[in-house]
Amino acid sequence: MSKVRLLFFIQIILFHSFFGQSVLYSTVNKKAIKYYEKAIVCFNNISVETGKPDIEGTENLLIKSLAKDSTFWEAYSLLSNLNIEKGDIKSAIFFRKKMMFSSNSVPIIEYYYLASMQIAVGNYKECLTNAKRYQQSPLADKRFMTKINRMIQNSLFALNAIKNPVNFKPINLGPSINSELPEYFPSITADDSTFLFTRRVNDISVSMGRQEDIFVSKRDENNDWSNSTLISDVINSDFNEGAPTFSSDGQYIIFVGCETGAKGDYEYGNGRKGYGSCDLFYSQNNGQKWSNPVNLGPPINSKHWETQPSFSSDGKTLYFVRGMTYNRERRNPNNQDIYFSSILDDGTWSKPKKISSNINTPYREESVQIHPDGKTLYFASNGHPGMGGLDIYMSRMQEDESWSSPVNLGYPLNSFMDENSILISPNGDLGYFSSDREGGYGSLDLYSFKVEEKFKPLPITYLKGKVIDAETKTPLTAYFQLSNLEKGNVISQMQSKIGNGEFLITVPNNIDFALHAEKEGYMFYSKNIYVDSINLSEDGFLIIELEKIKSGTFVLENIFFEKSESDLKQSSIVELNKVLKLMSINPEIKIEISGHTDSDGDNNLNLQLSINRAKAVVNWLIENNISSDRLFFKGYGETRPIEDNNSLLNKAKNRRTELTIIEK
């Protein structure tokens, strides 16, 4: 049981047991009362050095009290509370039960306390019995009814989940990742090659003697994780840094930095400043090293607690957890929700909004991951029907962009303990989580497990490659867009890496899309790709050669027509807009649009079709304010094939629309 929950139980139990009762005890034995009242004083005598009560002294006095009267239920109650303070919940339950059997005058509220402890250790059957007893009592305090109803709901869910367990066989990630120190909050790149996580390290230079840092590991030649190392001295400091999230290509990292709270200076380590509590920062890898982290600023960060970010693979949306704080020193763990913010056209962040009420509850949500498929959300919560503590859930974005009702990932992945730090691999086969279960290297370790089919994200793959200058072959930093041709919307956008020109873009399956690469002074690159069950990553590295704007001919791969017609399909708009942009920012150039067909059918019909198709493109550009004296069109029919017309694939390549810069 977590320390937070222990303290919660202590507060409510002590209040009702000690101050809610009359001074008239259930016993008339004066010696029993004397020992009991001494025990109360002893229990409330908090040590200045340890911050804890005199547990041993209190326990001895209570044993003496019960020796004088074994039906003195108040003494059993305090003895139960004492074991909560010791962290021994099972013994606390034992003495609570003895209290119940010792007297008929035990208040009904004690059934509420007993049920609270029983669900906290996974004793669901007895919790259900005692919770229902309290629920059905006419003396029940209505203020506790919401919590009692949740205990009943969770107990029923848990009993059913235990009868129908999911396949779950966790495997420790081993000493290259784990240590005797706690490891948690993992993140991974879309190509499954780089792994980030948080480790709480010992540090005698800080007041608490420990702080959090971010570590990194990469796949080696055997596909195993290499020995983890600190990610960078620029990112890590002697303050807390953790809960990192990668952009899909690993070029950007967003992480949490927390201030000390000392002297009101909002210091976040390495000279960084913030807005209070924990803030989100970002850093970019330029191919050689990480840049100095920058605070994301308002409206993302606030005086409250921002943490556990997850960056969408399309580079558009950031999901994170915000916890409301009472003040700089105190945070309410039960007022904690998932928010999201999107990058606007001007490059700023939109005002964060709470994600759907289907996901957020009046209780606690955390450990959010938006999968690279962009549609599947994994998170932890104690507000949905579950096993009693924080459980892991999955929700899917619907066609109308609403979120489905969360699905619990089941027992034994979820248990009466708190589960979080969930991460599902890009291909959906493996899940990662943090646990302090037996057999680890000490404290919290990171584990992997096979994800059941029903909990997997939507299938995706990735496109990996490099952008170079067509003539010099030097790497280029280019801007990328991945567009859905059917809907005409941008699916993903990013730029190739500074220094080496490499890129990695996640690609949804079963979508016909256009890939465009642009750089000022260069002709845009266009490619049409359809992804089905084939993993693009298996096809190797895609080398994109950008040519400087000059006289030359380029294939427009994403111009489409109805079969044997010259009517432009709606899916051509993405490409047409790229040509429009080229003409608009380069007013000095003139172009010829040429149409080509394969060799099927009549030669004359093919020639006329190619002319009409080229003319259709020119007419669209004229309708969009490009001067007609800069535009020319011509049809070549089947006379200029680029491949032999001996296969369906080659014929498709020959059916094309080309753009030729004829004057610059």
Name every feature range the model reports, one short phrase each.
Residues 520-543:
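Structured interaction patches on ligand/partner-binding surfaces of diverse proteins
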Residues 501, 511-521:
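A short, solvent-exposed beta-strand micro-motif common in secreted/extracellular proteins
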Residues 381, 385-388, 594-664:
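Periplasmic OmpA-like peptidoglycan-binding domain that tethers envelope proteins to the cell wall
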Residues 486-502:
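Short, acidic Ser/Thr/Gly-rich low-complexity loop/linker segments typical of extracellular
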